[in-house]
Regions:
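Polytopic alpha-helical membrane-helix bundles and their juxtamembrane interface segments
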Residues: 1-222
Length: 222
């Protein structure tokens, strides 16, 4: 079965390039057709590479379904459902980081520092985004969401230090890409649209997912 993963990982990259082409050309029909194939392919690649790593491909599945909901981003309720599915995927990543790198046994001061930094990061994002997102509820939702991105980025750094394994920095890189992608998505959805908006959103999103998945896979047996 692992042979299939060696086919599916390159297929994911090929499909990503094709999808990004349609994003750049603003071909809505084929952009919407190709988008759901991306995380489905990546999730299947993980499944065939390491069937026991079910949480990794379950997180990909939540992103796959979330992608489908976000195709209807003009409907605010559907957009919220899609965002919630991505939040579940991030929570799965949080659990993986804590359980895989023994973060559950680290000193409580690490969590105190996390709490302080998360509050600071959330407040900074809340006020930085203010010129681009006037609605208080939407700005609050954005700030809370990116706090989860920050938490996973923080845990990936702590995991790197605890395990002496720099491969966890791939997960950090992934969450930096996620922050760029989701910030662009929020601004263009709730403030002002830009030409070819889907190209930078999807480019950074796909780099984020690939970095995170590779980070978890490459640290499987370490």
């Amino acid at each position: 079965m692992i042979i299939l993963s060696y086919i599916l990982f390159p297929l994911f990259i090929i499909l990503s390039i094709i999808h990004l082409y349609f994003c750049y050309k603003e071909n809505e029909k084929w952009r919407k057709i190709t988008k759901p194939t991306l995380l489905l392919t990546l999730g299947l690649a993980v499944l065939f590479y390491s069937p026991s790593s079910y949480l990794i491909y379950i997180a990909c599945f939540f992103c796959f379904v979330g992608d489908i909901f976000l195709l209807f981003n003009k409907n605010e309720k559907i957009f919220v459902v899609g965002g919630t599915l991505f939040l579940v995927a991030h929570l799965i990543h949080t659990f993986l980081l804590i359980s895989r790198s023994s973060l559950d046994r680290i000193h409580f001061s690490i969590y105190i520092i996390l709490g302080i930094l998360t509050i600071v990061f959330g407040l900074l994002s809340f006020f930085i985004i203010k010129p681009y997102m006037k609605n208080l509820d939407k700005r609050t939702s954005y700030s809370l969401y990116v706090c989860f991105l920050f938490i996973n980025a923080y845990f990936s750094v702590v995991a790197t230090i605890i395990t002496y394994n720099p491969l966890y920095l791939l997960i950090l890189l992934g969450y930096i890409f996620y922050l760029i992608s989701d910030t662009t998505l929020f601004i263009t959805t709730f403030h002002r649209d830009i030409p070819r908006r889907d190209f930078p959103i999807m480019l950074t999103y796909l780099l984020a997912e690939l970095s995170i998945v590779l980070g978890f896979i490459l640290t499987l047996n370490l």
